[in-house]
């Protein structure tokens, strides 16, 4: 029976999303203007943030771009923020957007090399605990020099490769032409293996994700907000590393211990081993690849290896904006591996562009947070505290809590600007400012692993094409991140309270760093 036109509109709205979800989004769209105009703009702002988090939490039911975008468009339409403020946010974050557009696509053209290296690691290390530590450590090391998003893009690219190899064989299809998103052709015997394999990949991805946070906090190029904080404090690479170390070193060590413990104890969804059948398939695949590898393929691997060296050097030395380095990777990799058709290049951009659009929506929510001054009460309360030690601990906690709901780049920027203003007005000393900058940096980077909205890398993982394949939902990510969240947050707080001041004083005495004197550059705008 054909449906009526009215029903057709309803059916088309948000497509296959469940009916209750559609009703919830429509309810949000009706409630927001009422709260904004009749009750309180501040309450409406927090309501919008909560609704946006809800759309992220339901990412597997419906990609957050559509519902989140509708909420953002309405927020701008009713005056919660302005298109100019949204544009200001986007312009201020142009580096992150360029990174997503070009760097993720650049990694796509390095796939053969990455699969080659990671297959060796995966098949070479039999112990799951050691393998998890290797993934966590490698992600941390890379994130200290590259951006966390780039590292996660690498890991996702590798995981999709592994997943599709097994899926093809289990479905009885030839390696060439196969759709790894469909499970219909898989037999019951292999279905258990597939579930275990999904759990295995999930745990490795989460270890790598947390690894990016462990490494990203240590250096000024690790995360975008680190650059902003270092810039405001006038620190260079070496000084940033040394000033952070009283907090970041204990956190890094405890993070790796946590990684080993959750695997050994098989808690919080960790501990799944690589099923033997799957290992055999990967071993066969590796052998087959080696047999059929021509000189042309070997040449491609060499070229990709050289480009990988260029990528790490260029990023570590900050030779250009991250996205532009990504563009150079695309140009070099495609030129020297012979990818010259437009349609075969287009595939590389499929993964990141929906997320880039989602991030633009995210920044419009950030614009609402700025215009409605949603974080102001928290910031004012913390700055009003007299005792310096308590102030440090509170800054860390407040940053951590806000970073869990909002983008850590935004939280870090807002806080460092407020502290800078306090310094300019003579409310705090330069010495206290330096300590607070450490508290802000570690506060935004460490506890924010709690939820995918805190870390852009986690959000990218959650909304990637891989997440539904390995059944990685928002809730599952929060549960799997929980042991790390607790350990990182508590050890970080201990570092701030007990190690930071004495260690900084001994660094001064040893002459590794010198106390800063004099004024700083004026404060940057409230954006980023």
Curated annotation (Swiss-Prot):
It is found in: Cell inner membrane. It catalyses: 2 Na(+)(in) + 3 H(+)(out) = 2 Na(+)(out) + 3 H(+)(in). It is a multi-pass membrane protein. Pfam families: NhaB. The keyword Iron-sulfur does not apply. Its main location: membrane. NCBIfam families: NhaB (TIGR00774), PRK09547.1 (NF007093). Na(+)/H(+) antiporter that extrudes sodium in exchange for external protons. Can also transport lithium and potassium. This is Na(+)/H(+) antiporter NhaB. It comes from Vibrio parahaemolyticus serotype O3:K6 (strain RIMD 2210633).
